[in-house]
């Protein structure tokens, strides 16, 4: 979508949390260190879904602090990247795991505050993926078509604000 002049690198790791006290903190992953070492011009941060699990969300008081730590790390890079924060995708899962009520009523407002505080752009994947449960076979992870819809939403946000 971005063309040959852009080099897109995925440093995502499945099932990771923004919360450093979460069950699988992203900032403890080699991928996080590699993302910083890559010294990108654009950063898209999409975390929060797994933070909504009750055993992670009990540490919600740390969410904004931990997210700010990550934002500051990317802001401090020599490349001074443009940083985008994503609202987590709609979660169609029900039960004791990932909780869309927590995502929509608590995590998204926190991300919104962080974006405003840091003058960052937001990519609203929650709205972009709303009403499309058929694109999430396991009710949480998108299939190929769902990934394309998400990629298009990210692309449109990045290209609109260049």
Positions of PLM-derived features:
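Generic structural signal for well-ordered alpha-helices
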Residues: 32, 67-71, 108
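Glycine-rich phosphate-binding loop signature in dinucleotide/nucleotide-binding domains
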Residues: 35-39, 77-78, 161
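Conserved beta-strand segments of alpha/beta enzyme cores
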Residues: 7-9, 82, 119-121
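Conserved SGNH/GDSL esterase-like catalytic core that processes O-acyl groups on lipids
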Residues: 1-65, 92, 102
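Helix C-cap/helix->beta junction micro-motif
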Residues: 2, 77-79, 118
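Catalytic His-Asp segment of secreted/periplasmic serine-dependent ester chemistry enzymes
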Residues: 89-162
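Active-site segments of SGNH/GDSL-like serine hydrolases
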Residues: 46-50, 73-105
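Structural signal for conserved beta-strand scaffold positions within catalytic alpha/beta enzyme cores
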Residues: 10-12, 85, 124
């Amino acid at each position: 979508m971005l063309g040959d002049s852009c080099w897109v690198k995925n440093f995502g790791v499945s099932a990771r949390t923004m919360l450093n006290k979460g069950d699988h903190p992203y900032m403890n992953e080699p991928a996080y260190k590699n993302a910083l070492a890559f010294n990108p011009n654009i950063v898209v941060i999409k975390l929060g879904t797994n933070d909504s699990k009750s055993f992670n969300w009990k540490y919600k008081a740390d969410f904004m602090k931990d997210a700010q730590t990550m934002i500051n790390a990317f802001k401090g890079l020599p490349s001074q990247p443009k940083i985008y924060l994503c609202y987590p995708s709609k979660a169609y899962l029900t039960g004791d795991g990932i909780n869309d009520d927590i995502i929509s009523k608590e995590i998204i407002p926190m991300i919104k505050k962080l974006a405003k505080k840091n003058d960052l752009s937001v990519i609203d994947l929650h709205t972009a993926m709303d009403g499309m449960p058929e694109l999430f076979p396991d009710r949480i992870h998108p299939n190929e078509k769902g990934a394309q819809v998400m990629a298009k939403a990210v692309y449109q946000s990045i290209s609109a604000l260049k």
